[in-house]
Curated annotation (Swiss-Prot):
Name of protein: Nucleotide exchange factor SIL1
Compartments where found: Endoplasmic reticulum lumen
Span of the signal peptide: 1-31
Alphabetical keyword list: Endoplasmic reticulum, Glycoprotein, Protein transport, Signal, Translocation, Transport, Ubl conjugation
Length: 462
C-alpha cells in the first residue's frame, strides 16, 4: 500500500505536463482554423438564410381548398386545408396524411373550423380589371333581363286574376245582374223618388241613398246635368215632413263647396223654399235639415247672400231663434252669422292685399250689407242674450259672434246692462274653471281661452 501511494505521487507531474500540452494544441487549432468554417460570416449567413426561406416557400403547398372530413378516414391531398378540430394521422404504409371527424362530431360538422380554415390563395394575375368589368356588365345585363322577365310573368299572372269590365258586364247580363255607374244609380234613385207609384218609405230610402252619392262634387254636378237636382228641390214643397227633411238633406250635401250646383239651386228656387220651411211650423228635425241646406247654399256665395237679405232671411232666422224649444238651432244660426260676417271681412282684406279675387266677385261681396241689417233688425241684443245658454260650446260660439259684431254693436252693448251682468257672472265662473285647469297642468286650456274672450270683451266695453 505505501508502494502504490509513492507511485501516484511520482506520476502527478507527468499528468500536469500532458494537460498543458493538450490545451496548447487546442488553441493552435482554433487560431489556424479555415475561415470557411467560421461560426459568424454575415454575408454568407444572410445569403443562405434567404435561399432557405425561398426554398421553404417553394416547398410549402399552396392552400387552394378546404377539406371536408367525414366520419371515415380519408386521404388528404397537398394544398387542402384541414378544419380545426379534425383528427389527423399519418398512414405509415402509404405515407399519406389521413383525416376524419372526432367521435363527438358525429352529428354535426365543425362550422367554426370551416369558416376559419377556408383560406384560398388567389392569383391576382389570373383576371385583369377589364375582365372583371366585362363580367360585371354581363351580370347586370343578365339581371335586368331576368327582372324584365319576372315583371312580365307577374303582370301576366295579375291579368289572369282579373277580367275586362266588358266581359264581366256580359257575364252579369247573362245572370240578370247589371253593373251600374254612379250616374246610372242616381238616375234610378231619382226615378224611384219621383215616381207616383213609389211609397213614402221607398221615396225616403231613395233620398237617403242619393245623399251618399252627391257628397262627391262630380256626382252632384251629374245630378244637375240630367235634371235630378230640380226634382229634389221640388221635393221641398212636399206635404210630407219626412220628404222635406230628406230632400233638404240631399241638397245640403250637394251644395257644399260646389259653386256650379249653388248657382243652379238659386235659379231653381231652392232659397225661397228653404226659407218657407224655416218660417212655417215644421218638426225640429225638418227645420234642422233645412237650416243645414241654407248654410251650405250661402257660404262662399255672395250672390246668394244678397238674395237672402232681399227675401227677408234675417227676419226668418230671428223668428226661428226666438221660437221656444229652438235653442239648438239658435246656436247654429249664430254660427252662420259669424261665418258670413268674417267671410265678407276676409274677402275684402284679401282683395286689397293680393288682388287675386275677381272684380266681379269682390263687387258682389261689397253689395252684401250684412252688418247694417243685423244692427237694424236687433241682432245685437238677440246675440247678447244667447250668452245665457248653459252649454260651454254654445257660449263659445256666441262670444265669437259678439266679437265679430263689436264694431257695429258697440253702443248697443254699452247700454245692455243684462249683457254686463252676464259677462261678470261668466268671468267668475271661468276664472274658477281655468284655475282648476292650471292645477292639472294645462296653462292654455279650453276654459282659459273662454276667460280670455270674456276679459277682452269687457275691456272693450269699459
Amino acid at each position: 500500500m505505501p508502494h502504490q501511494g509513492l507511485l501516484l505521487f511520482r506520476m502527478a507531474p507527468l499528468c500536469v505536463l500532458l494537460s498543458m500540452l493538450m490545451v496548447s494544441c487546442f488553441n493552435f487549432c482554433l487560431c489556424h482554423k479555415n475561415s470557411e468554417f467560421a461560426l459568424t460570416n454575415p454575408e454568407k449567413s444572410s445569403t443562405k438564410e434567404t435561399e432557405r426561406k425561398e426554398t421553404e416557400e417553394e416547398l410549402e403547398p399552396k392552400i387552394l381548398e378546404v377539406f371536408h372530413p367525414t366520419h371515415e378516414w380519408q386521404a388528404l391531398r397537398p394544398g387542402q386545408a384541414v378544419p380545426a378540430g379534425s383528427h389527423v394521422r399519418l398512414n405509415l404504409q402509404t405515407g399519406a396524411r389521413e383525416v376524419k371527424l372526432h367521435d363527438e362530431d358525429k352529428f354535426q360538422t365543425n362550422l367554426k373550423g370551416l369558416k376559419k380554415g377556408k383560406r384560398l390563395d388567389i392569383n391576382t394575375n389570373t383576371y385583369t380589371s377589364q375582365d372583371l368589368k366585362n363580367a360585371l356588365a354581363k351580370f347586370k345585363e343578365g339581371a335586368e333581363m331576368e327582372n324584365s322577365k319576372e315583371d312580365q310573368e307577374r303582370q301576366a299572372k295579375v291579368k289572369r286574376l282579373f277580367r275586362p269590365i266588358e266581359e264581366l258586364k256580359k257575364d252579369f247580363e247573362e245572370l240578370n245582374v247589371v253593373i251600374e255607374t254612379d250616374m246610372q244609380i242616381m238616375v234610378r234613385l231619382i226615378n224611384k223618388f219621383n215616381s207616383s207609384s213609389s211609397s213614402l218609405e221607398e221615396k225616403i230610402a231613395a233620398l237617403f241613398d242619393l245623399e251618399y252619392y252627391v257628397h262627391q262634387m262630380d256626382n252632384a254636378q251629374d245630378l244637375l246635368s240630367f235634371g235630378g237636382l230640380q226634382v229634389v228641390i221640388n221635393g221641398l214643397n212636399s206635404t210630407e215632413p219626412l220628404v222635406k227633411e230628406y230632400a233638404a238633406f240631399v241638397l245640403g250635401a250637394a251644395f257644399s263647396s260646389n259653386p256650379k250646383v249653388q248657382v243652379e239651386a238659386i235659379e231653381g228656387g231652392a232659397l225661397q223654399k228653404l226659407l218657407v220651411i224655416l218660417a212655417t211650423e215644421q218638426p225640429l228635425t225638418t227645420k234642422k235639415k233645412a237650416l243645414f241646406a241654407l248654410c251650405s247654399l250661402l257660404r262662399h256665395f255672395p250672390y246668394a247672400q244678397q238674395q237672402f237679405l232681399k227675401l227677408g232671411g234675417l227676419q226668418v232666422l230671428r223668428s226661428l231663434v226666438q221660437e221656444k224649444g229652438m235653442e239648438v238651432l239658435a246656436v247654429r244660426v249664430v254660427t252662420l252669422l259669424y261665418d258670413l260676417v268674417t267671410e265678407k271681412m276676409f274677402a275684402e282684406e284679401d282683395a286689397e292685399l293680393t288682388w287675386d279675387m275677381s272684380p266681379k266677385r269682390l263687387q258682389q261681396y261689397r253689395q252684401v250689407h250684412l252688418l247694417p241689417s243685423l244692427q237694424e233688425q236687433g241682432w245685437c241684443e238677440i246675440t247678447a242674450h244667447l250668452l245665457a245658454l248653459p252649454e260651454h260650446d254654445a257660449r263659445e260660439k256666441v262670444l265669437q259672434t259678439l266679437g265679430a259684431l263689436l264694431a257695429t254693436c258697440r253702443d248697443r252693448f254699452h247700454q245692455d246692462t243684462q249683457l254686463h251682468r252676464t259677462l261678470g257672472t261668466l268671468q267668475a265662473e271661468y276664472q274658477a274653471l281655468a284655475a282648476l285647469e292650471l292645477q292639472e297642468g294645462e296653462d292654455e286650456g279650453y276654459f282659459r281661452e273662454l276667460l280670455d274672450s270674456i276679459d277682452s270683451l269687457l275691456t272693450e266695453l269699459r
